[in-house]
């Protein structure tokens, strides 16, 4: 009985968090906004993206960042070219080999992000990446809207 209740609570929390993320994306249409979505399971992230598509009436562009990436800005601009998607979801940060360098360079380039991107940028992070953001790039972390947790 307890596991059923916990499971139901978990589903409610996930749905609520997904709705919060969808609302944040909708409110940021046509302008840059950095959103952090924290989920420790990559499989769960995929399920959440499917659920998110049910809440959003717009096309979400997904970008899986390669493990060899050294800068987030260059990786995104190379992938998008001159395209300005309605929203961009970046996944795979947990697999980046030089994650510390990527986080520091993103912090240094944060003003360029807002100048170049006219869409909400959602970074999917896990607890470890979130801790690194706090320690290595507190300005970037503070610049982002509140972290939306999917636990």
Question: What residues fall within each predicted segment?
Answer:
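Conserved catalytic/switch belt of AAA+ P-loop NTPases
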Residues: 103-115
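Conserved P-loop NTPase "ATPase switch" module shared by AAA+ and STAND
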Residues: 80-102, 116, 120-127
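Cytosolic/nucleoplasmic/matrix-facing N-terminal domains/tails
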Residues: 68-69, 80-81, 113-115, 129, ...
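Short acidic, S/G/P-rich loop/turn micro-motifs used as interaction or catalytic elements
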Residues: 41-45, 66-71, 93-100, 128-131
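A short helix-turn-beta junction within AAA+ P-loop NTPase domains corresponding to the substrate/partner-engaging
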Residues: 136-151
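Short, aromatic/basic amphipathic alpha-helical patches
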Residues: 47-55, 106, 132-140
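Extended, compositionally biased accessory segments flanking or bridging domains
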Residues: 1-86
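Conserved beta-strand segments of the P-loop GTPase G domain that flank and frequently precede/overlap
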Residues: 35-38, 61-66, 88-96, 122-125, ...
